[in-house]
Amino acid sequence: GEAVSDTIDDPVIDEIAQTPSIEVTKEASIIHQAGTDSEISAGDTIVYTVSVTNNGNVTISNINFTDDLTDGQGNVLSLTSGGPNDWGSISLAPGESQDLIASYTISQSASDSGSIINTATATGDSPQGTDDVSDVSDDPQGTTLAGDDDPTVVNTTLNPSIEVTKA
């Protein structure tokens, strides 16, 4: 007889684990109102730099942001410029970062509350669309809380005083 040979034509599939991951940090810098001292108070502007980095091994697309800004009493504030409505949706390749800028001019009532508290959240899609990726901003200069997702807090200077003159 003749030898019979048979080959298997099934391809070998090596799956590469997708690990989508983003990290968001937010830092604040102060622009003091012209002619004022270095104390943080009404009229000064807080400039927020939000940095988002793709720490995973796959591209993250449709990254959108929310931004929560409150005063020390929990009253909701609105950014003066920049923010999620201006930033739109972005995509980041593995290892890629992008900085986004927003600002808030401190109102008297926010200054009187003693602090302005800000947190950004980024949410994006993995390539398969099945794993949403999300991260809450961390203030790298702030107090580290459990999970490293601490808000960016700017404390205002409170100098209450009253002068009474009797004639």
Could you tell me what each predicted segment is?
Residues 1-167:
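Exported/extracytosolic protein signature
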